Amino acid sequence: MAKDGFELYRYTPELGASILFTVLFAVSGVAFVILLFHYSVKSKRRVGSLMKSQPVLRYYGTVNLAGAYIPFIFGCFVECVGFAFRCKSSKDTTLLNPYIIQTVFLLVSPTLYAASIYMIFGRMATLLFAENLMIMPARFNTTIFVIGDVGSLLLQAIGGAMMSKVTSASSGSHLVTAGLFIQIAFFGLFIINEVLFIFKMSKKPTNVSVRYGSWKYLNIALLVNSFLILIRSIVRAVEFIQGYDGEIASHEWYLYIFDGLPMFLLVLIFIVAFPLINIFRIHEESIQAQQSARFDGTDYPDVEVTSIEEDLASKSE
């Protein structure tokens, strides 16, 4: 129990499972950092070579593309820290700080994965010249979803911290539930956006999408990961609706089956798929398609810009 007599856990956290997931997320985070660095450097050289033959194209800077994966990396290490502090709690369930850290970190880490998914999808649609196929204006698409993601993150973080005290546990639970429902709402809208994007693209393909098919596999990977986060968030929302004495909160296996495992599968999909389908590859294919379109006389929109960042900035003026 905590100092005020409030019982932090309804069970004693399993040490073995906590260690396993701590190691899995730590190794995954390090592995992805290495992959990201390798493919960023490789893509920069490749794009530089392509641009020599036709420099006036629509493109992203390498740092901007790599930046879409940064929240994902933070998510891996935040998840790692969360499970590491569950190891601490397994030895003494009355310690308050480990409880707060593991609660908050395990709650908010999926919002970091979500931020990367939003940004990768937005960049992919822009490189495909298919912004008009999204359900909201391209300039605001990623921003709106990320704002919702940040709002969800803050509510869950604040609520998770408040749950450590008996006097604020109920209010904290309500905040976490609200944050989870915001996440569910935005993610539900985003999944609809992804699915509609696939159907619209099949009926109205762009010059990039008809020349290369990598974007389809990247979008499928993003869609699968989106469903993993959605399922996890729904279960966690039910947990907090049931309350402290509910079925889910009273049994640790729910945390691993419906939170730890789905989030590790998400991370695994990112890592395994990355060498084959990533935003750097879409970027290179977009440049090649633009060059081919210009050389063979195909009509191609918005090519006469030096970068996507400058193009979008000019449109907002």
Curated annotation (Swiss-Prot):
Residues 38-64, 121-142, 200-214, 281-317 are cytoplasmic. GO terms for cellular component: endoplasmic reticulum; plasma membrane. Residues 1-16, 86-99, 164-178, 236-259 are extracellular. The chain crosses the membrane at residues 17-37, 65-85, 100-120, 143-163, 179-199, 215-235, 260-280. It holds the Pfam family RTA1. This is Protein RTA1. It is a multi-pass membrane protein. PANTHER family: PROTEIN RTA1-RELATED (PTHR31465:SF1). The lineage of its organism: Eukaryota, Fungi, Dikarya, Ascomycota, Saccharomycotina. It is found in: Membrane. It comes from Saccharomyces cerevisiae (strain ATCC 204508 / S288c). Disulfide bonds: none annotated. InterPro entries: RTA1. Belongs to the lipid-translocating exporter (LTE) (TC 9.A.26.1) family. Involved in 7-aminocholesterol resistance.
